[in-house]
Amino acid sequence: MDRNYPSAGFGDPLGAGAGWSYERSAKASLVYGSSRTSHPETDILHRQAYAAPHPLQSYATNHHPAGLSGLFDTGLHHAGSAGPDASVMNLISALESRGPQPGPSASSLLSQFRSPSWQTAMHTPGPTELFISGALPGSSTFPSSSALSAYQHPASFGSRPFPVPSSLSLQDPPFSPPANGLLSPHDVLHLKPSQAPTVPSSLGFERLAGGGVLGPAGLGPAQTPPYRPGPPDPPPPPRHLPTQFNLLASSSAAAAAAEQSSPQLYNFSGAAPGPPPPERALPRQDTVIKHYQRPASAQPPPPPPPAHALQHYLSCGGSYPSMGHRANLACSPLGGGEPSPGAGEPSKAGPSGATAGASGRATGPEAAGGGGAGGGGGGYRPIIQSPGYKTGKGGYGAAAGGATRPPPPRSTATPKCQSLGGPAAAYATGKASGAGGAGGQAYSPGQPQGLLGPQAYGQGFGGGQAQDLSKAPSYSGGPPQPPSGPPPPGLATCQSYSPDQLQGQLYGVQGEPYPGPAAHSQGLPTASPSLSYSTGHSPALSGHGGGWGPSSLGGGGEASPSHIIRPLQSPPATGRPPGVGSPGAPGKYLSSVLASAPFLAPPGAGSYAAGAGGYKGKGDGSELLAGPGGPPAERTEDEEFLIQHLLQAPSPPRTSGADGLVGEDGAADASKGLGGSGGAGGPPGTPYELAKEDPQRYHLQSVIRTSASLDEGATAALELGLGRLKEKKKGPERGGETPEGLATSVVHYGAGAKELGAFLQKSPPPPPPTAQSTQPTPHGLLLEAGGPDLPLVLPPPPPQLLPSVLSHAPSPSPSASKVGVHLLEPATRDGAPQPPPPPPPPPPPMPLQLEAHLRSHGLEPAAPSPRLRPEESLDPPGAMQELLGALEPLPPAPGDTGVGPPNSEGKDPAGAYRSPSPQGTKAPRFVPLTSICFPDSLLQDEERSFFPTMEEMFGGGAADDYGKAGPPEDEGDPKAGAGPPPGPPAYDPYGPYCPGRASGAGPETPGLGLDPNKPPELPSTVNAEPLGLIQSGPHQAAPPPPPPPPPPPAPASEPKGGLTSPIFCSTKPKKLLKTSSFHLLRRRDPPFQTPKKLYAQEYEFEADEDKADVPADIRLNPRRLPDLVSSCRSRPALSPLGDIDFCPPNPGPDGPRRRGRKPTKAKRDGPPRPRGRPRIRPLEVPTTAGPASASTPTDGAKKPRGRGRGRGRKAEEAGGTRLEPLKPLKIKLSVPKAGEGLGTSSGDAISGTDHNSLDSSLTREKIEAKIKEVEEKQPEMKSGFMASFLDFLKSGKRHPPLYQAGLTPPLSPPKSVPPSVPARGLQPQPPATPAVPHPPPSGAFGLGGALEAAESEGLGLGCPSPCKRLDEELKRNLETLPSFSSDEEDSVAKNRDLQESISSAISALDDPPLAGPKDTSTPDGPPLAPAAAVPGPPPLPGLPSANSNGTPEPPLLEEKPPPTPPPAPTPQPQPPPPPPPPQPALPSPPPLVAPTPSSPPPPPLPPPPPPAMPSPPPPPPPAAAPLAAPPEEPAAPSPEDPELPDTRPLHLAKKQETAAVCGETDEEAGESGGEGIFRERDEFVIRAEDIPSLKLALQTGREPPPIWRVQKALLQKFTPEIKDGQRQFCATSNYLGYFGDAKNRYQRLYVKFLENVNKKDYVRVCARKPWHRPPVPVRRSGQAKNPVSAGGSSAPPPKAPAPPPKPETPEKTTSEKPPEQTPETAMPEPPAPEKPSLLRPVEKEKEKEKVTRGERPLRGERATSGRQTRPERSLATGQPATSRLPKARPTKVKAEPPPKKRKKWLKEAGGNATAGGGPPGSSSDSESSPGAPSEDERAVPGRLLKTRAMREMYRSYVEMLVSTALDPDMIQALEDTHDELYLPPMRKIDGLLNEHKKKVLKRLSLSPALQDALHTFPQLQVEQSGEGSPEEGAVRLRPAGEPYNRKTLSKLKRSVVRAQEFKVELEKSGYYTLYHSLHHYKYHTFLRCRDQTLAIEGGAEDLGQEEVVQQCMRNQPWLEQLFDSFSDLLAQAQAHSRCG
């Protein structure tokens, strides 16, 4: 092994192969996956051999980072230690930046990561692992995470390798071949031998499990045997385990976790294997993971999917990010839990984690169900995190009862873990096992790292491990009992695990229960970092980060992920921390890794620092915290050193934010203390002590720290939440075992929660500078006293953090809030119930914190308890709920289950429930976190993978578990389903799935378990299980009964809660829902029944989602998931939110949906609604949930009801108000959503009285106020056209906008009013989705709106949702736009058009079963159906229900009847209103980031979402609202387009409002913006029937149908891909005949060539017809443009029409014609009304524009317009539109729709051309130019120049010159190859210059000599004769400079005679200089390009040519400068040629 180790190969392969692969592979994550997989298999073997062996430990981390770096930078591997951080950071940044492209990109990234990771760490298991990792990356979303995971894993692996050197060896070969078998066996073998007695079996198991996990992951089956071999138990479990493992494998972490040591490595391998498994794991997946994994697999790369899925799962469950590990966790529930059984199997001892976990608290249960939870949680987690996880899970599982410890098992600590049993036990054992067991440490390389590090410290731990082991054994002996006693034992265990955790051990040894948890905590922090990383990745990472981060952390890596997850899982954290913390080495490593994963760095760093430091700190610190200040310190030192060492290089990068955190390793450590133990809390000692005392706190701290660490608080939070959940679970489990344990756990959580909150807060702070400050606070918080303090301080930070976390990007706030809430809540809950002593303090702090947190979030705390509840309700609703979406229900569910009811019902249930309350709350809280995590990638993948896995898992292994769990579940079903107790677990389980979900399904499941603490609750988990909380489920299966009692109390709530959990699943649950969920649903159904209404709403939401989702989602599943994921991910910033949202929506709906999924769906307000609208609504809920995190839960519940666009939003707003702080977070969305949701929910009484009433009141009040406001404003709005528009709105179209306006009152007062009405109606009628409009919004729009909102918000609101939302939105936009038509007549015409559009959209949607189409279809058709259904049923209810809405609705119906004919229109029109919500969503995201104020900033985010409209909307939402509303829909897509793009991670590409199809877009002659060169010669076509789908897909970012290049009589197929988030098409070798009537079946499409790589052409579809035809189109465009201009914002609407451009085209043309024909008239007309009702006119205009421009690059325009509009609108919300319109009018003349063009080119220069840009200025005008052309088409080159086409051409020209500067032969080569990319632009520009030169020449009389001189010399000196001199009127021209070759621009070698002087007339001198400048312009520009390249090359080391060119081209200011000088030159030439 060592020998392998040495092989730097790992580094190389890692770095090189994988690392760089990412870049290259990024494009094809799949490729990477496959490639990686294939290549890695062999390569990896080698790599693996070395890599793993590689001193990953110290290096691994780095390596990982390096891997990451590698990802980023092939050289990364060389980056090794220093690189890691950077690389990670790079990775993260890359991931984030590429978030959109996540799929491949992320994949590849991850892949890179992963590969390296595996290569690195898992080399041994590498192949599989790597593959898995790779595969993981495969899962688009996951990739990042996966990569991270893998990436991180290496660290753990690295460590692991040590321990597993032999193993590695074994693994190496065997691994390679069997990948899993060997891995497993070898793992087992190695481990076993390594492990020694207790450990052996455990280890063996663990190893086995790990290996098995891995194996299963890798081999699944093969592994299974090995796995089984380990323990007899395993066999059955193997299935599970495999599943688990698969999950794990997928999770890799699971495996890794499971085998933290070797396995960990392997685990990573596992994780890695996961991916490969997909290849090969697929079968395995089939086996176990298959369900889960397969879904993952389902993701693009099946292999990745597993990991992904796992991670997803994890993420979901384990905070997605932890994903890998967490995935395990999450998976655990799924497979882990299921695996739980697997774990359980392991529990039996197999997966030590499971075993341990099972053994731990639930040795039996775990095995049975507790194990499931622990095992499942632990098991699963274990699987995923087997070691770490388990460990963590131990922490988690430990919490789970050590079941979690399966992770420990990973280290064999399982037994220990088991032994530890307690979380601590699990932990300890996990850790110990991992650490100790690994000798475990040694063994648990992953752990080892940590272990090693810790071991380092102790190995002590290593030894400690043994000791731990012994301890563990003790525990082992009494794992179950330890569970009770485990806390302390856990601590001891912790100790044990600590070894893993080392610190844990140290501390654990301390035996402080807290320490255990602390360890967890540590793990968590670690996890957090992971998370952080994840978060960094946010979507991918986030998802992954968690898994990843954890991985990273877990990597020290695996552990990190594991523990991160675990930490998330809390115990897992512990376990993981070992990875991370334990890893002193890993910690170091982790740190490194974490740091490495810079994303983690902050968190990681922090975490790491904390993890490393904190780790150390955490582990150490944690442990320290735990109490062994000394050892920890020691460890810290050591670890710190390592970490620092590792981290340092890497950390610093990460450290930036985290650095402080991490960077501080020591300090950070201390600082991290917080993270680490309070670690950074400056007072490491204190924190430590505190930690000790308050390990929970510490834990939380850890968690929080994690969060904090997490920059990506979201993930961190999630993770934290998960961790907490886990911890909770653990606690509960433990608690169950022993209240104390619980307390510990809980306390951990509680304190942790607080801490978490603090940390979260802190976390964000880390992200923000505040973080650091905050950190101390959190620190303090950590400290008991600090608690309150922290809260105080925290609150502010939390928002930050929250935002950070939540939004991760834009949505952090919500996320944070959610997280905070969850954390806090859980803390409180936990604290309250558990906090006996420490807990209580924590609780107070928690409450305080919570309160502060809430407040900070905008949640208003109520009573602490109530507040908690409310918080849960509110916060959760607001922030969390958003997360929870249904989470609210979730919280209730948890609350209900445990505390769910408390949430709604009160805390009693929670309390009654047995600490469940806290748990419940906690769970929910966690859930949000989890959710956050989950949604990211998880959602999609999960949906895809998740479901299958669930089903399979449930069906198969899961089924077993499930059966187990099933009955209990059934029992608990009520509990889970309806019963709160189960609910929480369910939630939890879902949590794992959707970490944010319930308490964290996987991890959370454990958390839930904690909730259930209750193992019973775990059963609830079972409920969750369906979600994929199998682990939890199984885990909980046993406990279901206990939960059942709670269920009753919490039924109402619980349903929601349960629902939430399920919802969680729902995220991806559809399938899960169907499967696992089914039980849940079934069981839950009844309980849910009460809340049925709520659920109906929620359910509807869920159900809808489920139904729609299932069909659409599932149908779209493959694509849609990715899309969704992308969607979720797409909004990286949003991602967190999205994640959260996603989860929540799903959760809410999910649970219900799950339950609802059952037919009971109808249960909720009406199945129909659920079916039709709900589905949409769910989206909205998600949106609401996501966007209105705070409100969401409330919203979620409410939202379902108030899913309507405005309504939900508004409710949210109310909610927001209610959660005032939250509001800021989500303000728009939040508030509206909350308000709406709240109102609606309230109406429905979502399940939280608190929630309801609060929400209701607030919502209602708010809504009413808003309505009033709107109404007041309405008169204005109503003026003239506005009035008609208002009617239109009333009809529903604009309602949402109104609502939105309501949300953002400014948004659209008029709109607001109508929306208000709907809102009101909706509110009352939320279930029905009150007004038809709303309902349709809910349905058509709800989905769309919700989606939009969510998407806009970047909520993951449901990845599924987002997609749906997107589709729906798109559809809606289409429909709405047309229907929106600004005018009544327009309306009518548009109605027709709309119908057409809708039909086309629908057909498109239907056509492409793309998620979009499907969803859209669903929205359109189905939404129509749902909308229809909604409109039908909902409308009916809506009408009645929606008081106002009803009225508006009828109008809508009436007005939209034409559209309505296609019901979709009505719904669609209604959808427009939803768009407003989306808009709010947009704003919301910004709000997430900031409230309305934020909204402007967010607008950017949102703007992207609603490029034109949104952007205006956010700032001028009020004014923009109306506009925004309709546009919003489009905007939403648009926003999604932009937002998604960035955010959209893997599967969804950036949105494009439309596609330039010949005939449809010709009128818009604008140049198509964007990169690439239009080659006139090439003709591309698309099937006519695919056009709508294409447009829809482009708008939603989903996968479009293929396009074809005409090659004479053949058509060459170009298939869609995503690169850098951008949708592009790659040439394939598939051809079709193109002759005869085939030619009639295709329509020409305009594309631009992007590049030719490997002889493959890559093109992108233009949104507008390329510039090649600008003149004519320009003119036409001018006219159209004027409207466009006027309605630049309107661009978004066009987007909508875009989908059905064709149909719309006619209408467009027709309806447009009037406007077009009378643009001025029309324009003016709208302006007048516009003034009164700007929005409307704007919207109208937009619509018109849309119409006019139709598909014109609305997007670009939108963006531009958004930009412009934004400023304009911002300036005057109302005015902008008006001004805009008027402006538009002038613009009209100039025809400059600055917005449009500006988008791409003027992003920076936007200001110029923005609002006033002026025709030329606005030259975004380019298109405008067209307008200008009318003036003088060619007259003003300047103007022409400013066109987008010209800009693109010029950009290409500069790129060519830059390339020439780097390669002198470039131009010649271009000529020789007849390059079509650069030559045409060059020739055009040269021709332009020559043309002007000739014109100038006409004014000159040049002598041949002078002309020759001017031509020869590039410089010209002009000397004016002085006065009095004879030549007074003359000027001397002195040509100078070095002559050059005009063609190649290279200097002439021959000497040229020196130029003489020439005298010319003064008046003519300007002509000479102008002529000279024109002649030499190319050379002069070339020289400037050369200077630029030299500057870049000078500043960076060996950059490749490509990189230099890219950097130059990214220098927008420089490009603008060049372009401006070029424009000026031509303008000058023009002026001179005219006069003279």
Curated annotation (Swiss-Prot):
Biased segments, Gly residues type: 367-380, 391-400, 543-558, 673-683
A UniProt-annotated Pfam family: DUF4211
Record-listed Phosphoserine modification sites: 332, 340, 651, 865, 1077, 1135, 1308, 1381-1382, 1387, 1568, 1925
Major localization listed first in the record, in broad terms: nucleus
Keyword Nucleus part of the UniProt annotation: yes
Compositional bias annotation for Basic residues: 1199-1208
Cross-referenced PANTHER family: GLUTAMINE AND SERINE-RICH PROTEIN 1-RELATED, PROLINE-RICH PROTEIN 12
Associated pathology: Neuroocular syndrome 1: An autosomal dominant form of neuroocular syndrome, a group of disorders characterized by developmental delay, impaired intellectual development and ocular anomalies as primary findings. Variable eye abnormalities include anophthalmia, microphthalmia, and coloboma. Other common features include congenital heart and kidney defects, hypotonia, failure to thrive, and microcephaly.
Protein name in UniProt: Proline-rich protein 12
Gene source species: Homo sapiens
Primary gene name: PRR12
